[in-house]
UniProtKB/Swiss-Prot annotation:
Active site per database record: 463 (proton acceptor)
Protein name: Probable bifunctional tRNA threonylcarbamoyladenosine biosynthesis protein
Annotated binding of Fe cation, by residue: 112, 116, 133, 290
PROSITE patterns in alphabetical order: PROTEIN_KINASE_TYR
Length: 545
């Protein structure tokens, strides 16, 4: 094929209940893009019924598409290889193979999740965004680092779209339920307290869903339950995006996926980005949900940069992780120019995290820092006050508690509950993140020993990242706002998973060396074998579908 000319690719999307066919050129012009959604008659999506829908609908859409772009003009066939429902993926792959063989054109299978990111970049001004991808089957925070799109954060159980749809079905709303939840939420005026579960840059939604169902069953107004469900879940999503932003130091945030159509979620993220002084992007609604154009576009990007597939390589991968894809279409040179920005920290602060502003000062005669958990404009007042106060008190308590376990921590000088401030001793040193970037890994085994001591004492940090250790003559642990007491092996396993993913996201080139040293140190904890085994089980449950 002559790749010097403008190529035309047809894309087939069929990972769940939406059937999409799109045609796009290599200069980004969308020639055709149409999606038809399967609406189940009663309950949720049955995989076989969704697959039957694809088999019928692909034929109709293909006929319509080829009236716009003649079949002889198609240069490339692309399809969603995964992740998704097995039966749906198989029908999609079969359709793409059949067309590829009949017109004798190359075929490319692409990652569904990354397709959302790349079509979003095409349709906005985003260059290097941190992406929140939210849909019926996926909830991920993605960032490009080191030739891959890394999963920085995600749901530990169900996806946000699934959460909203399950709640809607419980309340006898039509499918897709998220639209109706949003509609009812607009008329809600009472905030009902529901579980709020953030663990580092991950969230859990199953407990929230169960609690919301119980509130509905207890005769709370449906408008108020929908309002509270949205405020809670979307605040959690916005928070983990903000945490990932602080961790990766990106200067752009992009929202993609079917749930990106929700106006309240867009509003929350927009407010957060303004507060963090970064740019926010959302593609047009047509390109937020599943569609064929995004599949075709990623197919073109991969093909033009050397990707080739044999028919034997086109077997669907239902658990196709974003970070399994080698990104061959982004040049590292693109990230060495003035177009790629980093998040800017205000001059009067020495640090600005996802939760707090950090300033340096003097307390009596001692060097100190003040950590102020600032108001979050994206959260409603009732929820924001509750979270900020609870985490301020919790952090002070745990900083004192870990000292009893022989772990170094800053000394607390003052707690201002009203303004959600903690003043503590200033630690001279560097955060672990900086030490690792310099290539100094000598302290990493100590991190594992420290975590083992915490777990031995029944303390789970819940936000272990390389930004929450300060290395000087000794290693100090900070930022216990999400901490809790727990003897559950799974809680300790998730603690390590949070740290593992934070290391992988920005220290990917040193991951093996860093992680092996940490685990070597963690083996000083008597229950290390049980925790490490549990880690494997939890990682298998991670949602990529």
């Amino acid at each position: 094929m002559d790749t010097s000319k403008d190529l035309i690719c047809i894309g087939f999307e069929g990972t769940a209940e939406k059937t999409g066919v799109g045609i796009i050129t290599s200069n980004g012009e969308v020639l055709f893009n149409k999606t038809i959604i399967y609406t189940p008659p009663v309950q949720g999506i049955h995989p076989r019924e969704a697959a039957d829908h694809h088999a019928e609908t692909f034929v109709k859409l293909l006929k319509e598409a080829l009236t716009v772009v003649p079949i002889e003009k198609i240069d490339l066939v692309s399809f969603s290889l995964g992740p998704g429902l097995g039966p749906s993926l198989r029908v999609t792959a079969t359709t793409a193979r059949a067309l590829s063989l009949s017109i004798n054109k190359p075929i490319i299978g692409v990652n569904h999740c990354i397709s959302h990111v790349e079509i979003g970049k095409l349709k906005t001004d985003a260059l290097d965004p941190l992406t929140l991808y939210v849909s019926g089957g996926n909830t991920q925070v993605l960032a490009y680092t080191g030739k891959k799109y890394r999963v920085i954060g995600e749901t530990l159980d169900i996806a946000i779209g699934n959460c909203l749809d399950q709640f809607a079905r419980h309340c006898n709303m039509p499918h897709p339920g998220g639209v109706y939840v949003e509609k009812y939420a607009k008329n809600g005026n009472k905030f009902i307290k529901l579980p709020y579960t953030v663990k580092g840059m991950d969230i859990s939604l199953s407990g929230l869903l169960t609690a919301a169902m119980k509130k509905y069953d207890s005769k709370e107004r449906i408008e108020d339950v929908c309002y509270s469900l949205q405020e809670n879940s979307f605040s959690m999503l916005t928070e983990i995006t903000e945490r990932a932003l602080a961790h990766t130091n990106k200067a752009e945030v992009m929202l993609v996926g079917g749930v990106a159509a929700n106006n309240r979620l867009k509003e929350m993220l927009d407010i957060m980005c303004i507060e963090q002084n970064v740019d926010f992007y959302v593609p047009e609604r047509e390109f937020c949900g599943d569609n064929g154009a995004m599949i075709a576009w990623l197919g073109i990007l991969q093909y033009l940069n050397g990707k080739r597939m044999d028919l034997n390589d086109t077997k669907p991968i239902s658990n196709y992780r974003s970070d399994m894809v080698e990104v061959n279409w982004i040049s590292e040179n693109e990230f060495n120019n003035e177009n790629i920005k980093s998040r800017i920290i205000p001059e009067h602060l020495i640090g600005k995290g996802a939760e707090a502003d950090i300033s340096k000062g003097i307390y009596l005669e001692f060097e100190s820092i003040t950590k102020e958990r600032v108001k979050k404009g994206y959260r409603i007042l009732e929820l924001d006050e509750l979270i900020r106060l609870r985490r301020t008190v919790k952090e002070a308590r745990f900083l004192a508690s870990i000292k009893e376990l022989g772990i170094y921590a800053p000394s607390i000088f003052d707690i201002d509950k009203e303004n959600k401030k903690i003043t503590m001793s200033y630690i001279h040193g560097k955060i672990a993140k900086e030490k690792i970037e310099e290539g100094n890994l000598n302290f990493c085994e100590d991190l594992g020993k420290i975590i083992g001591k915490m777990h031995s004492g029944g303390i789970v940090h819940n936000d272990l990242t390389t930004s929450n250790f300060i290395v000087s003559d000794n290693t100090f642990v900070i930022d216990f706002g999400l901490g809790k007491y727990s003897d559950l092996v799974e809680d300790k396993a998730i603690d390590l998973i949070v740290l593992k993913k934070s290391i992988m996201s920005i220290h990917y080139d040193k991951f093996d060396s860093v992680w092996n040293k940490i685990i070597e140190g963690y083996k000083t904890y008597e229950m290390f074998e049980s925790v490490l085994e549990c880690m494997k089980e939890v990682e298998k449950r991670a949602r990529y579908l």
